[in-house]
């Protein structure tokens, strides 16, 4: 586990390269102009230095402002003209005589230059390029280290292109701006460190050491991006494949002459010799095989008749971190067994119930309540074998040892010794049997997921896996997804499906946003505070404090809520799948569901503020604490099984110091209940003197304006990348789908970038936890456009594979996005709850005189968590054909005649439902070119309908007539050969 260090420092990256991009100290914390004491002054501040430029935005922002030593004042900077047509600019420093330059610091106002160069000249006529860049600076403070000292009189920064990523801002920011242009004759000591080397340790094994520590400096290993390869103490673990690892060191001047810095190195770790004999093979063959990007199971035959070394199974998502190929295949036979090691039994097998069926997992009393067991993992593996449409056999789960394993069996057990695998790593030895080991049950779960992906693919009818040895582990600790279940009700069944699908891709963090309201600024209801109080809102959790009931039928989605027991059980069950559920109660903003019940506690600075709690009101703060006390109660609280809870804290527009004090109180309350706390980062935008402790506090970086990543990193907070412009989904809104190609080709979990800046937090730091994407159901209330649970699921699933690859961090990933997404489509997650497309053909005859003329005539219906789920022959309000789902009713402009047979066809697609009747077509959804769009309600823009078959025709007791119904799917293939009559 990486050890967090609270420190202020500079951060250096890639010290072995000619050009080094480095981080700044805290924004607003200005470090001295001298980087190496009096011996290495900023030469740009010297006497007689002139600064010139091609243009200025305004006269006061001249080139001279970039060499005045003042980087604290926003008015003391150079800014070029704002020219949308031409972003070519320069600023030049002319020195009175030749100087030697080794190190340059550029302090950008905005990191928006995406093509620029540092140039040098001795005569002001002929220039040479010292460093060229085709991407934006990683941080606002950019440090450039030259490969060797350069003699010069003229030093010029030339820019050629700036970011146009944001249409809204592109007209305003077509210029470049520098606070300071600093020049140094020598480079900081941290840049002079030699690359660390791997040696054999005296006690055995391998160790990473620095060749030499400079006199007067203390150098401490911070960590490695792959701590499963290089541990926190420098131990180099036994790898089976060569790995490139980035390590970071803290460099401190014990004399106080230089600033404290972080420096990083790229270290190649060769494979160790400790590989089981059964899978050892010629190193040359194995290396060649690992270069093979083919994603098939076939094993080529060598000329001597022996099987060639197996390539890494490329169809596994995310890709395997380390692979050593063997020869031949493992076959899953019907006689196979799952053997669970006897020492892997923390408590009795008899105490377990089916971990998936009915979503009911019983937790044993003698084990940690928040940890799944190997028995749970084995049961999930057995169940998945039974669900496979070709294999269809649950494997028996037996107690035993590794010696009991026979050919075709699968063994699950704890590793007998620590080898750097950590909480989620595992090994998998595949010969004629399969042996999966890990230090935790979570690691064993991920090993079984890899095995299942090998075995259960549509094209692998033989249920085989290539023999070989796997050592696999993630790059990032948090690999997540979050969903807003407040603005749109989301059934518990859908949450279970999402959780199980995440587990299939080794995504391990599911955030549930439980309370919110429609955005008041767009609601049209802000004429007064009282009017704003009528906006749509929801608190989706049973609460005695707020009077939220969560039992019985829910005729409308607005009333739907989870019981305390349902949520606690969901959190517990998810652990069995290796997924941490993070429940959230969002205050002090986004709290209309609270202030509606307690209107005196609302912030009333405007009509738009009444969804915020007035933190100047002591009773309002006490109410929030009582809500949390109920949720955290160790006996009955909905969050009692959660390891991490989210306390909200975003977009508050009240007093900054009151906000900081409130954050500190709620954080303390949750941590005293034994929880790690997560929140939406907002401290960069909320002034005040109180500094919340970063201890056990995780921060979602959703907006770089509300929480600057570098500033928060310097303050010691643990960070999760949830940057809105890359990772937010607003179904039907501005962020309708994620840009998977952008994520695949340019995005990185530790990189925060937009039109204004680019900041990279080191992956080797324990503070850089990972990333998550999020669905926000902003299109609710007055903006409701009919998004369904299926629409949510489609948007959830599409980027899942790409993000799992990036967050797991395997370096063997496909270079082509279509090939990558193609692999996702081949796999299919475990038992998805919905089918994407269908066709229903039916013959319908309504009675001329039904028994009850005003009752609905239902062709088919199904059970649902809230509202009603049915397809109408006669919708009771209009008498027309239609359907209802999730609290919304959709009407086709067609009325069935009575007493005669009519042929109907219904086609369901994402966003569109089509009815064909009597030679006419009736569409509901986005295909507006078709006549008869129904009632014209805004929610009909998204008319997705999953056709129910739980109860059909007369089985409902709500259909007077005769019916024949045929169901088809995926291009018309029949699911039922005979009509359902």
Protein language model features and the residues they cover:
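Flexible glycan-contacting loops in extracellular carbohydrate-active proteins
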Residues: 924-967
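Active-site neighborhood of glycoside hydrolase catalytic domains
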Residues: 604, 609-696, 703-705, 709
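Extracellular glycan-recognition modules
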Residues: 832-887, 956-981
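Aromatic, loop-rich ligand-recognition surfaces of beta-strand-rich domains
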Residues: 16, 32-38, 71-129, 138-188
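Feature activates predominantly on carbohydrate-active enzymes
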Residues: 419-610, 619, 629-642, 779
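Acidic, contiguous N-terminal accessory segments
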Residues: 31, 266-442, 446-450, 454-471, ...
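Short, aromatic/His-centered strand-loop micro-motif at the edge of beta-sheets
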Residues: 882-903, 929
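Short tryptophan-centered beta-strand motifs in secreted/extracellular beta-sheet-rich domains
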Residues: 510, 570, 842, 900-908, ...
């Amino acid at each position: 586990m990486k050890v967090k260090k609270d420190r202020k420092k500079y951060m250096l990256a890639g010290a072995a390269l000619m050009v080094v991009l480095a981080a700044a100290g805290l924004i607003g914390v200005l470090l001295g102009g001298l980087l190496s004491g009096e011996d290495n002054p900023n030469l740009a501040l010297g006497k007689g230095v002139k600064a010139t430029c091609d243009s200025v935005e305004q006269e006061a922002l001249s080139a001279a402002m970039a060499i005045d030593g003042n980087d604290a004042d926003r008015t003391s900077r150079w800014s070029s003209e704002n020219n949308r047509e031409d972003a070519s600019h320069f600023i030049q420093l002319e020195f009175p005589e030749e100087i030697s330059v080794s190190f340059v610091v550029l302090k950008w106002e905005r990191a928006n230059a995406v093509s620029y160069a540092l140039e040098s000249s001795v005569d002001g006529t002929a220039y040479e390029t010292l460093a060229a860049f085709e991407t934006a600076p990683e941080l606002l403070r950019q440090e450039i280290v030259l490969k060797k000292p350069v003699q010069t009189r003229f030093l010029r920064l030339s820019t050629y292109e700036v970011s146009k990523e944001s249409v809204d801002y592109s007209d305003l920011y077509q210029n470049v701006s520098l606070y300071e242009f600093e020049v140094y004759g020598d480079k900081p000591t941290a840049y002079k460190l030699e690359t660390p080397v791997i040696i054999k340790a005296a006690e055995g094994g391998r160790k990473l050491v620095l060749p030499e520590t400079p006199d007067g400096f203390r150098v401490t290993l911070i960590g490695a991006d792959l701590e499963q390869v290089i541990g926190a103490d420098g131990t180099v673990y036994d790898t089976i494949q060569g790995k490139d690892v980035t390590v970071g060191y803290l460099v401190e001047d014990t004399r106080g002459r230089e600033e404290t810095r972080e420096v990083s190195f790229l270290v190649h770790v060769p494979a160790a010799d400790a590989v089981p004999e059964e899978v050892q093979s010629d190193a040359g063959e194995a290396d060649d095989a690992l270069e093979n990007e083919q994603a098939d199971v076939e094993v080529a035959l060598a000329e001597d008749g022996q099987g060639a070394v197996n390539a890494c199974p490329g169809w596994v998502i995310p890709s395997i971190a380390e692979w050593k190929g063997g020869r031949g295949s493992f076959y899953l036979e019907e006689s196979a067994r799952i053997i669970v090691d006897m020492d892997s039994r923390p408590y009795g097998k008899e105490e377990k119930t089916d971990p998936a069926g009915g979503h009911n997992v019983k937790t044993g009393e003698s084990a940690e309540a928040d940890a799944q067991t190997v028995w749970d993992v084995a049961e999930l593996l057995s169940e998945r074998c039974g669900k496979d449409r070709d294999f269809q056999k649950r494997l028996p789960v037996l107690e035993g040892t590794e010696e009991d394993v026979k050919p075709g069996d699968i063994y699950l057990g704890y590793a007998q010794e620590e080898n750097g695998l950590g909480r989620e790593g595992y090994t998998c030895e595949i010969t004629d049997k399969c042996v999966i080991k890990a230090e935790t049950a979570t690691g064993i779960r991920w090993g079984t997921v890899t095995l299942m992906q090998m075995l259960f693919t549509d094209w692998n009818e033989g249920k085989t896996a290539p023999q070989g040895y796997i050592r696999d582990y993630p790059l990032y600790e948090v690999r997540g997804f979050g969903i807003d279940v407040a603005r749109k009700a989301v059934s518990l069944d859908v949450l279970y499906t999402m959780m199980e699908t995440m587990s299939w891709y080794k995504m391990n963090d599911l955030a549930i946003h439980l309370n919110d309201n429609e955005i008041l600024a767009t609601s049209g209801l802000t004429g007064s505070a009282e009017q704003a109080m009528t906006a749509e809102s929801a608190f989706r959790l049973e609460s005695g404090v707020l009077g939220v009931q969560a039992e019985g039928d829910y005729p409308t989605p607005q009333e739907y809520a989870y019981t305390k027991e349902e949520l606690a059980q969901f959190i517990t069950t998810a652990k069995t799948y290796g997924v941490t559920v993070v429940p959230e109660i969002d205050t002090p903003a986004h709290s209309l569901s609270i202030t509606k019940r307690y209107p005196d506690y609302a912030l009333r600075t405007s009509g738009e503020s009444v969804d915020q709690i007035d933190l100047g009101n002591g009773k309002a703060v006490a109410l929030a604490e009582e809500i949390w006390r109920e949720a955290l109660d160790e006996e009955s609280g909905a969050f009692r099984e959660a390891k991490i809870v989210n306390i909200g804290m975003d977009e508050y527009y009240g007093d900054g110091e009151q906000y900081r004090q409130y954050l500190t109180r709620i954080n303390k309350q949750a941590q005293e209940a034994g929880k790690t706390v997560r929140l939406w980062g907002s401290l960069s935008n909320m002034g005040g003197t109180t500094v919340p402790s970063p201890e056990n506090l995780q921060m979602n970086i959703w907006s770089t304006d509300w929480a600057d990543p570098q500033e928060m990193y310097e303050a010691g907070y643990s960070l999760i990348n949830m940057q809105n412009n890359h990772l937010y989904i607003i179904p039907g809104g501005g962020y309708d789908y994620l840009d998977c190609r952008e994520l695949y080709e340019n995005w990185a979990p530790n990189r925060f970038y937009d039109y204004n800046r680019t900041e990279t937090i080191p992956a080797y730091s324990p503070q850089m936890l990972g990333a998550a994407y999020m669905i926000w159901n902003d299109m609710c209330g007055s903006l409701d456009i009919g998004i369904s649970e299926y629409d949510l699921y489609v948007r959830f699933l599409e980027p899942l594979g790409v993000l799992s690859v990036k967050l797991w961090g395997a370096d063997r990933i496909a270079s082509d996005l279509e090939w990558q997404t193609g692999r996702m489509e081949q796999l299919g997650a475990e038992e998805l709850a919905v089918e994407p497309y269908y066709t229903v053909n039916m013959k319908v005859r309504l009675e001329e005189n039904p028994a009850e003329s005003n009752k609905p005539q239902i062709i088919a219906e199904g059970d649902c968590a809230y509202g009603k789920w049915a397809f109408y022959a006669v919708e009771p309000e209009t008498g027309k054909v239609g359907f209802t789902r999730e609290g919304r009713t959709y009407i086709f402009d067609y009325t069935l005649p009575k007493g005669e047979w009519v042929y109907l066809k219904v086609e369901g697609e994402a966003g569109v439902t089509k009815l064909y009747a009597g030679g006419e077509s009736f569409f509901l959804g986005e295909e507006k070119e078709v006549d008869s769009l129904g009632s014209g309600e805004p929610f009909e823009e998204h008319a997705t309908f999953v056709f129910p078959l739980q109860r059909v025709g007369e089985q409902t007791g709500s259909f007077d007539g005769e019916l024949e119904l045929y169901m088809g799917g995926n291009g018309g293939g029949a699911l039922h050969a005979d009509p359902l009559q």
